[in-house]
């Protein structure tokens, strides 16, 4: 189990993080950065995260993040596509969340509709959680504008764009 401000940084065209358990996440548990390859693939397989004050997975690179068989509890967001990066990759990001259970989490995924981001949910178990928060991202470092939520309710499978 890990405790610190930021935990794991994956730099480049992809990585696999398997069966890692984070507790008391302060800033981000996993940060993905350093790639402009739209075909980059990042995998989070198994594991869990608890007590994240903000987000668990921060996606600053291009590409797609695949989160599967994961448990998250007591956190702000499971996943956030960068909504105000003023350097590095600026463009479409995607996340596919499968077989995930969320408890006491504000939002499963935060995406930027103006960048073409999407979040796909399959067999996700949650209650009292917003599945997808949609934002208008920017490239100037300012806080992005929240547009609203989608995929809420008891639906365990949907796509948010």
Language-model segments: residues:
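Extracellular beta-rich repeat passengers
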Residues: 1-2, 9-161
């Amino acid at each position: 189990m890990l405790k610190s401000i930021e935990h794991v940084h994956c730099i480049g065209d992809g990585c696999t993080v398997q069966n890692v358990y984070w507790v008391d996440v302060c800033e981000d548990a996993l940060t993905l950065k350093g790639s402009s390859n739209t075909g980059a693939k990042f995998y989070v397989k198994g594991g869990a995260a608890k007590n994240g004050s903000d987000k668990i997975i921060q996606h600053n690179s291009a590409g797609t993040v695949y989160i599967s068989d994961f448990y998250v509890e007591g956190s702000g967001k499971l996943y956030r596509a960068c909504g105000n990066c003023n350097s590095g990759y600026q463009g479409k990001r995607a996340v596919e969340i499968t077989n995930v259970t969320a408890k006491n989490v504000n939002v499963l995924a935060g995406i930027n509709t103006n960048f073409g981001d999407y979040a796909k949910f399959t067999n996700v178990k949650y209650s009292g959680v917003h599945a997808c928060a949609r934002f208008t991202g920017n490239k100037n470092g300012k806080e992005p504008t929240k547009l609203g939520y989608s995929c809420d309710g008891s639906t365990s499978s949907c796509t948010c764009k």
